[in-house]
UniProtKB/Swiss-Prot annotation:
Pfam families: ABC_tran
Span of the signal peptide: none
Enzyme class: translocase
PANTHER family, per database record: CARBOHYDRATE TRANSPORT ATP-BINDING PROTEIN MG119-RELATED, GALACTOFURANOSE TRANSPORTER ATP-BINDING PROTEIN YTFR
Role of this protein: Part of the ABC transporter complex RbsABC involved in ribose import. Responsible for energy coupling to the transport system.
InterPro entries: AAA+_ATPase, ABC_carbohydrate_import_ATPase, ABC_transporter-like_ATP-bd, ABC_transporter-like_CS, P-loop_NTPase
Region (Disordered), start-end ranges: 492-522
Family per record: Belongs to the ABC transporter superfamily. Ribose importer (TC 3.A.1.2.1) family.
EC number: 7.5.2.7
Name of this chain's protein: Ribose import ATP-binding protein RbsA 1
Keywords linked to the UniProt accession: ATP-binding, Cell membrane, Membrane, Nucleotide-binding, Repeat, Sugar transport, Translocase, Transport
Amino acid sequence: MSNADELLRIEGIRKTFPGVVALDGVDFDLRRGEVHVLLGENGAGKSTLIKMLSGAYRPDGGRVLVEGEEVRIHGAQDSEALGIATIYQEFNLVPDLTVAENIFLGRQPRRLGLIDRKKMEADAAELLARVGVQVSPRARVRELGIARLQMVEIAKALSLNARVLIMDEPTAVLTSEEVEKLFAIVRQLREDGVGIVFITHHLEEIAALGDRVTVIRDGKSVGQVPASTSEDELVRLMVGRSIEQQYPRERPDSGAALLSVEGLTRDGVFHDVSFEVRAGEVVGVAGLVGAGRTEVVRAVFGADPYDRGSVQVAGARVPRHDVSAAMSAGIGLVPEDRKGQGLVLDASVEENLGLVTMRAATRGGLVDLKGQRDAAARVAGQLGVRMAGLGQHVRTLSGGNQQKVVIGKWLLADTKVLILDEPTRGIDVGAKVEIYQLINELTAAGAAVLMISSDLPEVLGMSDRVLVMAQGRIAGELGADEATQDSVMALAVSTNQYKPDKSDKPDASAGKTDQKEAPRGH
């Protein structure tokens, strides 16, 4: 490929912040009509690199060249003028403006000194058609779902005549169907000659969409490889070591039942749900979207009501719809939406770790601040939370470190039963393995873990037993030695209702089926 095809080149880029080297000699290049994947763990330096290309940061050293010419990017206007557009995970759109107004914000076409709305909406409609989204240019942005918001962002980038499009984790919150639509648009943009920098944590997306991959580790570019490179090799480049087993489940002998759920029913949502989780055991809960998994565990935790049934911890009944009672009984919940429900983003690491134990640390109306601080430091160290200090706001932590803080607050509370709802969603492969090791430590210490995950390989790799839900009921149970993607999905699409065996040890063969259906574990 000739130099004429090179859109962007970065040579030896360096960026430091007080006490931190964020980028240390990063090299990267992008060609016309290619998808170049940028891969690395959270904290590796990807975001810093993106912010320099978009004008938010200035490099301390190195060079940036656009179509062979060295350039200086001092702000967003410089970046746009060079044909570089960035789509962040958190969209840069104004909710109360229309789609057309957002696409041309600050660049509205004018006629006789007034905004030419007819032309603006016609141009917006043309751009929206190009990205294949059926939405009115007059629609308010606040009325749109995530997938359509993303298409509006892409249309906005095209309105800038962007030659370089940077996409930061664009599939993180999309369904499988929406991902396929996005991929079709990205492939069309590639055909049109746009160079795309694609950042993702989903390794399976690399071979499906990418041409080349640059791996960043600890602020350095450590390799550039074809997108056909094996996942094992990509993981090795990312984390600097070979991961022999991505799901390092250690299975201690299970003890007595810690969590017992019997006949749990919420009319119209879930019906007659019964199961047990024993000390030292990880029970995975699989199922399709809408199967009722999250609704059941929220009811177990007391966050949502239920109409009939019972929840017991270590043989003692837990009052329904009472979070305080559930916590006192030793139940903890790490919610699916860790930012919205599991953390106070503008509070410190120390404050977040102490959320659950604050009441217990209060004597005579006074909080034992030193005790709380010492305990927070101990747990943060135990979990390996990467932070500047306990006073750092959790908003500024990577996704993996935020999740460690959410789990850490339950460790401080000596939780007996920990419910994990999508525990590794949106975090990189290295941080996932750290979460899995933490699950091993919890069960080795005698805790019971109930884990919901839409990542089927994760469920299969980390569970001692798998419960499969369908249409608000438990359709079956599979032991670790027989659970496969086919057997899980056959139950997930069935209309069976499974009743657990009440013997001391669960019958691993219950719920078996000969039906076959291979899923995509997204």
